[in-house]
Amino acid sequence: MSKLRVGLLFGGRSGEHEVSISSARAIASALSAGENASKYEILPFYIHKDGRWLAGEAPQQVLKSGAPLLESSNSSPADNNLVNSQQQTLERWQSPSQVAEVDVWFPILHGPNGEDGTIQGLLTLMQTPFVGSGVLGSALGMDKIAMKMAFEQAGLPQVKYKAVTRAQIWSNPCVFPKLCDEIEASLGYPCFVKPANLGSSVGISKVRSRQELEDALDNAANYDRRIIVEAGVVAREVECAVLGNDQPQASTVGEITFNSDFYDYETKYTAGKADLLIPAVIPDEISRQIQDMALQAFAAVDAAGLARVDFFYVEATGEVLINEINTLPGFTATSMYPQLWAYSGIPFPELVDKLVQLAIERHNPSH
């Protein structure tokens, strides 16, 4: 029986390029472990920070070193069939010949152009199965404003928020103060300012005063044209993993504890900065509620394959508020998603195997 050729797609043109490499290394290792070694052949594809797709030796080098390629010269023409970005657009989007050899794609591109529906649209056009959500689920899972609207429609409780645009923030001096007045009146302090379309806590600020609010809005506008401001809440941060397509399963619930002021990019991806507690020490009925809400959120955005759903548990009142869904969660050594499933009885190699099989199942539905 011939091996299934898995196109491991990583890197990308986003601020989470290095995170993508870390996830890809873990997945490549899992696809080569135990029984998976006899089932799968890995075809790695590395998307350079300049947007070029590289196959052959270049992605192997990145997987081995864990470091991104910094210079175009690091890859020879033999390893890269995609020409320079300075050349014609038509030529630039010629893909490496190995693309045609892929049986199923495993995109592990975090952030914009990776988990926002864009790469999912391309893979859909290729008519090849791929791991994870389709265009709609990915787009809703990436845009925090659209996501919250979907949650609201599904009746899921969440923190108060206000959506603003870059145009409002960078408008004339008369409009911006009024915008800040509205935010102060409706949300108060502390509150969180977030770019709508960036993952891994990039560009997020916790603000406690008018000056901090103004600075945070200006900073977030550098990252995105859509910004969301959320009311702060005193709560424990808990997470639940979801696995499946139309009949998904929810994992046990985990909790994130950290000493920093909030769960920012550095805290998330630096060993020792945050602790993952699995299972979370919370009442059983709260765990069941979180699992049920995670499945509702998964359906609300039309997710598929996998997702991690984040919640606030307000211990003082017993209230559970949904924070967000991540349709392509990290697969690094410190990532919550694979650890939640490991505790729930699905070790990492088996989890990766299930995700590949779910991709094929979704592409080829049967009665």
Curated annotation (Swiss-Prot):
Mg(2+) 2 binds at residues 324, 326. Its EC number is 6.3.2.4. One of its GO terms (cellular component) is cytosol. One of its GO terms (molecular function) is ATP binding. The keyword Cell division does not apply. ATP binds at residues 184-239. SUPFAM superfamilies: Glutathione synthetase ATP-binding domain-like, PreATP-grasp domain. It holds the Pfam family Dala_Dala_lig_C. Binds 2 magnesium or manganese ions per subunit. Keywords: ATP-binding, Cell shape, Cell wall biogenesis/degradation, Cytoplasm, Ligase, Magnesium, Manganese, Metal-binding, Nucleotide-binding, Peptidoglycan synthesis. Belongs to the D-alanine--D-alanine ligase family. Cell wall formation. This is D-alanine--D-alanine ligase. It comes from Trichormus variabilis (strain ATCC 29413 / PCC 7937).
